[in-house]
Amino acid sequence: MANPIVGRVWKFGDDINTDAIIPGKYLRTRDMQIFGTHAMEGIDPEFTKKAKPGDIIVAGTNFGCGSSREQAPLALKHSGIACIVAKSFARIFFRNAINIGLPLMEADVECQEGDEIKVDLFKGEVLVPEKGIFKGNKLPDFLLDILNDGGLVAHRKKVKGEHK
């Protein structure tokens, strides 16, 4: 996992539902690229045409609420989103994102869509040029380890290999 994560901002509001992140009609596929090409389609059908790899989502409260589908963070990850910063996350979305290796941070950040920001997960800070540093909730070390290893499955394989 790269740290800090530097990327262009896409802004979203409160209560962004998993059904809006990846509509249910795409849930039967196992092709991750299909998930990626339909990310955020329920809110902005053109999102994946505009977003670029390395971009960052900044959102309000309760990001990822709704049904507990792992496909929602997978869709964002496979669309190229490098990180999500939100005032708060639905708990199941938060853990699903960690489990698949999608970095995120809870922070109240003042920025505009299109701004380039720097997210430092190890410090729990977001730097917005000309606006300053916004303190967020630093992830515990064990969650940073999971993200660093690329997600829970990769982390377990690494840990298991270290204990042989």
From Swiss-Prot:
Q: What is this protein called?
A: Methanogen homoaconitase small subunit 2
> What HAMAP family does this protein's entry cite?
LeuD_type2
The entry's function note states: Component of a hydro-lyase with broad substrate specificity for cis-unsaturated tricarboxylic acids. Catalyzes both the reversible dehydration of (R)-homocitrate ((R)-2-hydroxybutane-1,2,4-tricarboxylate) to produce cis-homoaconitate ((Z)-but-1-ene-1,2,4-tricarboxylate), and its hydration to homoisocitrate ((1R,2S)-1-hydroxybutane-1,2,4-tricarboxylate). Is also able to hydrate the analogous longer chain substrates cis-homo(2)-aconitate, cis-homo(3)-aconitate. These reactions are part of the biosynthesis pathway of coenzyme B.
Under the subunit heading, UniProt states: Heterotetramer of 2 HacA and 2 HacB proteins. Cannot form a complex with LeuC.
- Top-down, what is the taxonomic lineage of the species of origin? Archaea, Methanobacteriati, Methanobacteriota, Stenosarchaea group, Methanomicrobia
Q: Which GO terms describe its molecular function?
A: homoaconitate hydratase activity
The site annotation (Critical for substrate specificity) covers R28
What are the protein's UniProt keywords? Answer: Lyase
UniProt cross-references to NCBIfam families, sorted A to Z: LEUD_arch (TIGR02087)
Record family assignment = Belongs to the LeuD family. LeuD type 2 subfamily.
Which GO BP terms sit in this record?
coenzyme B biosynthetic process
Q: Which InterPro entries match?
A: Aconitase/3IPM_dehydase_swvl, AconitaseA/IPMdHydase_ssu_swvl, IPMI_Swivel, LeuD, LeuD_type2/HacB/DmdB
**UniProt keyword annotation of Lyase present:** yes
**Pathway(s) where this gene product acts:** Organic acid metabolism; 2-oxosuberate biosynthesis
Its Enzyme Commission number(s) read: 4.2.1.114
Q: Name one Pfam family in it.
A: Aconitase_C
Provenance organism? Methanosarcina acetivorans (strain ATCC 35395 / DSM 2834 / JCM 12185 / C2A)
Motif, YLRT: chain positions: 26-29
Quote the catalytic activity from the record.
Answer: (2R)-homocitrate = (2R,3S)-homoisocitrate; (2R)-homocitrate = cis-homoaconitate + H2O; (2R,3S)-homoisocitrate = cis-homoaconitate + H2O; cis-(homo)2aconitate + H2O = (2R,3S)-iso(homo)2citrate
